[in-house]
């Protein structure tokens, strides 16, 4: 949606193929709705640059289009002295990435902000927030269609052939057709590998391996025990147990 919106606003003729019967029913709606600050990514990496700049653009967009969001801040918590060095490393990395609002907190300061958290210290990220991802997607869809972009639901790309002028897409669903295009953007999430494999002539060595990382989501009934997003020190590829809050 974001890519299609941007292309349509730039004056391109855009058709967005959606395999499902509605937008955002897969990975776009299965996340914590967090606007990240850009702390965790290696310095000067593409992810770090995009996250820091994207955060600013997303807050700006939400303000302009009345998309519900909130800068509630995030605590990265050290629960033992042995984790202090990791917290300091994250602080240096975040600062190097351009996250200029990070603050180190001692145990008493953490307790004052979050009475239900026991910690040795924490790193406080003021610019981390949450967004209503469903409302954001609907806003993107509105922008796309207002710019004469077309959203085609129940329209899987069953196969793609490379042509002299671009690509020919075999679109399935209830109204199958062939669509010719000069530009094809593969933004299919977990279906990315399968989509690339369906492009005739696409070299297999350029297709990345899909590795699943399972996540479990739980809903806590009643009032929240936290006032901010709270994250433990990350361990290898695991962010451990984190909390997110509903927008107030």
Language model features: what each stretch is:
Residues 1:
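Residues forming the Rossmann-fold NAD(P)(H) cofactor-binding site
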């Amino acid at each position: 949606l974001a890519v299609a919106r941007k292309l349509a606003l730039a004056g391109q003729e855009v058709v967005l193929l959606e395999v499902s019967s509605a937008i955002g029913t897969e990975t776009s709606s299965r996340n914590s709705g967090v606007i990240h600050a850009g702390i965790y990514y290696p310095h000067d990496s593409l992810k770090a640059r995009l996250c820091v700049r994207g955060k600013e653009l997303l807050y700006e967009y939400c303000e302009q289009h009345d998309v519900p969001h909130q800068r509630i801040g995030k605590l990265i918590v050290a629960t033992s002295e042995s984790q202090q060095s990791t917290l300091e490393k994250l602080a240096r990395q975040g600062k190097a990435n351009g996250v200029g609002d990070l603050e180190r907190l001692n145990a008493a300061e953490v307790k004052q902000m979050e009475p239900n958290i026991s910690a040795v210290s924490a790193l406080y990220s003021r610019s981390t927030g949450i967004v209503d991802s469903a409302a954001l997607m609907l806003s993107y869809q509105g922008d796309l269609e207002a710019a004469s972009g077309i959203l085609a639901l129940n329209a899987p790309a069953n196969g793609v052939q490379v042509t002299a002028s671009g690509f020919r897409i075999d679109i399935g669903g209830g109204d199958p057709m062939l669509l010719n295009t000069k530009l094809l953007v593969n933004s299919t999430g977990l279906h990315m590998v399968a989509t690339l494999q369906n492009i005739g002539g696409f070299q297999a060595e350029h297709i990345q391996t899909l590795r699943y990382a399972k996540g479990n989501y739980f809903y806590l009934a009643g009032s929240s025990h936290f006032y901010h997003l709270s994250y433990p020190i990350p361990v290898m590829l695991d962010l451990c147990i984190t909390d997110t809050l509903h927008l107030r």
